[in-house]
Amino acid sequence: MMPKHCLLGLLIILLSSATEIQPARVSLTPQKVRFQSRNFHNILHWQAGSSLPSNNSIYFVQYKMYGQSQWEDKVDCWGTTALFCDLTNETLDPYELYYGRVMTACAGRHSAWTRTPRFTPWWETKLDPPVVTITRVNASLRVLLRPPELPNRNQSGKNASMETYYGLVYRVFTINNSLEKEQKAYEGTQRAVEIEGLIPHSSYCVVAEMYQPMFDRRSPRSKERCVHIP
């Protein structure tokens, strides 16, 4: 809900000419305006200017693709009191370059626009760990790996796979709880892995991560999945 004492400021911005409004001090300007991206979910974040508490301000968000001259309003974040705005649907092409910008307004005053650095989802998004499912088959383990789902859709209407955009290497580790020993059981591109040679009457946990050779970076590790070998 927009604060009542800010409604006047919003109306003035929308209805008055630029010459009728005096820009606010620099301290009203939104700070640290940046995209934060995880699995191609692209969220614009910012901090309130130093002269106003965040709950006394309203914010206006615009975005554009690199090379475009016209900024587009983000309707859902036009006059918002939040310090973030989901621009996933406006930045769906992972290879394109985008900008976002934010302005603050309250009680007839407004700040200048603060623009993000150039943002490329493919380059900057962070990856979650793969989803891991394990099944015991006698004295061995079958491990199934699934990369995180993306908001992007393929031609059949299904969520695109992370493997559509990156060459991914999966790393699987086993932890022998009795010996408190970890070892790498697999590294490769397959999503179905058989782990053999396990010690009977022992408990094992399995974790996995994804590695991007092109960027030399890896995801966090998955949650442990544990099983007892009879």
UniProtKB/Swiss-Prot annotation:
It comes from Mus musculus. GO terms for biological process: negative regulation of inflammatory response. One of its GO terms (cellular component) is cytosol. Residues 1-20 form the signal peptide. SUPFAM superfamilies: Fibronectin type III (SSF49265). It is found in: Secreted. Keywords: Disulfide bond, Receptor, Repeat, Secreted, Signal. Highly expressed in lymph nodes and at lower levels in lung, spleen, and thymus. Not expressed in kidney, liver and heart. The record marks 66, 118 as: Critical for IL22-binding. Its main location: secreted. Disulfide bonds join 77-85, 205-226. This is Interleukin-22 receptor subunit alpha-2. InterPro entries: FN3_dom, FN3_sf, Ig-like_fold, Interferon/interleukin_rcp_dom, Type-II_Cytokine-TF_Rcpt. Residues 29-128, 129-230 form the Fibronectin type-III domain. One of its GO terms (molecular function) is interleukin-22 receptor activity. Receptor for IL22. Binds to IL22, prevents interaction with the functional IL-22R complex and blocks the activity of IL22 (in vitro). May play an important role as an IL22 antagonist in the regulation of inflammatory responses. Pfam families: Interfer-bind (PF09294), Tissue_fac (PF01108). It comes from the Eukaryota. Belongs to the type II cytokine receptor family.
